[in-house]
């Protein structure tokens, strides 16, 4: 645009105004139409009209001469209306401001004025911010002096003023940057006996604690011991400010956890669990979790102050989700402490946690599941868990790996040596659910192993054990179970599977399916491998190490015991014999492990029923070790040895049979005439199967905090940067991320 155009613009605008004065909603409050040349227009030409229809449109245009009063009024108010839209506070009479405004809508002038209003507002905020900052900066030295005054009234007034300043951003920043006034606030809070002053000073620290700079200032000024002292205040508002400030410090200030512990903060916090404000309790329990995580001493302090009882009480009595979640996290941390576990269980923790397994909150359900999982190995004798067991069986249909891990592990432990729980789970379709779980997660040891352990328990020593044994077969579980013996070997899973197969073999109807699934060659292969490993360590004179927590001798015992029960079936017995196992079984008679002596003599007792096998046993030189075992203190071993000797001596000469008869009489029947009967039953006397005596491991890690004060903060709980980190294996909680 050149200079000539700029000069001509006012002239063009004036000309336009003279001819189209009333055609704009900006200049007029009346509705207008397109002007015509003669003031009216009638469509009469057929060529311009639609066929068979006629329309008449009237348009009226006023000139300046026709309505001079209106023109004068509009010219007078134009500038005022723009000014009123831009700066409404300068106008006294607002009556004409809405002449063009339809109700609920802005005029064009008002829309155009919005940026200027926003700019004006920003300028005002900036002026106020600067004023607040300057005021606070000038006032801080005097306020510091007043806070240190000896007159309680002066101190009270000063604390009230500082409290007001701490509520505004600019003045709050100035306060945080003054170590002198923060120290004065802490000192005043610690020594005042006036409740109002205590409320004001704790409120100030609470306001400062929302900023990293404020947290550091409080920490350096010795604020933590003072805040811990305020936890004994009878004033609810003081308690709330103190606990929330400590919570922020624990979350985001390095060194705060140690400072709270040294100030006996835990001893002050645990009694606060008796309060009845759910939101206050949620913050308190989260503080306990932050302090207890990875610190055994803190866990013991919580125990010593009645923490487990208070936490269980909260889980039992409240419905506030955030409180239940934070409380369950504390219990989860404590549930891996050997001292706290029994206390939680005795306080009714299993029942209280089970109450929330059907909650709509996934994070609460998962915490409860992990805690139940960790506690379950010391809760095998607990009563009142029927509903929990049924829910856990239902949870086996979940697709969540964590849920399945917890549900299977808890069921495994709660069914260990507890006949009532075994029967209840069996009657609740537990066997079928566990089989489906194994089919879906056979490649996940964290799930498959406890699931197999639970099935091992369900198939032994309770009134519905036979029902469970048959149920495995009827739900096509045998092939899936036998496949778990395939390489690569996960020894804890292999050990549990061998024990389950032994129990399944107690049911004669399962022998054929087990045979068809190829269980005998797999067991023999495992037996040979594990025995060779055990012999290798014995030859080198080194103590046999555990492989994933399992000794090879345990695999030897398990495989031999399972083959012992399978050998009751003639077809299986012949298959075992054909795999050239007798030399190995005879060698196992020399084992120093009593349980291996028992199962090896037991399987030889079964094999000796066949003449060919009995001759092979004799040819392998079994008589000598069997004669020694006749004098074993274990009646089961002595009984099996006697039975084998009796069977292999049937074809011997009279002198040999007489000598064996004397040995048998002296060793067996002198003590118990029923021993021979026991040999036929193949159940060792007073010696429960060892796998049944073991609880499934209950060691799982606690939560691992994320980096504090970062972008990883949990969106569901703004002041808490945590994510759950469940895992398997032995618990190692002493590695916190600072």
From Swiss-Prot:
Pfam families for this protein: Arm
Membrane topology classification: Peripheral membrane protein
GO biological process: canonical Wnt signaling pathway; cell-cell adhesion; positive regulation of transcription by RNA polymerase II
Molecular-function GO term, any one: alpha-catenin binding
Protein name, UniProt field: Junction plakoglobin
Name of the gene encoding the protein in the UniProt record: jup
Keywords from the named record: Cell adhesion, Cell junction, Cytoplasm, Cytoskeleton, Membrane, Repeat
Subunit structure: Homodimer.
Entry similarity comment: Belongs to the beta-catenin family.
Compartments reported by the entry: Cell junction, Adherens junction; Cell junction, Desmosome; Cytoplasm, Cytoskeleton; Membrane
InterPro entries: ARM-like, ARM-type_fold, Armadillo, Beta-catenin
Function per UniProt: Common junctional plaque protein. The membrane-associated plaques are architectural elements in an important strategic position to influence the arrangement and function of both the cytoskeleton and the cells within the tissue. The presence of plakoglobin in both the desmosomes and in the intermediate junctions suggests that it plays a central role in the structure and function of submembranous plaques.
Organism: Xenopus laevis (African clawed frog)
GO cellular component, one term: desmosome
Ranges: ARM repeats: 128-167, 168-211, 212-251, 254-293, 294-337, 338-377, 379-416, 419-460, 466-506, 508-547, 570-609, 611-657
Membrane-crossing residue ranges in chain numbering: none
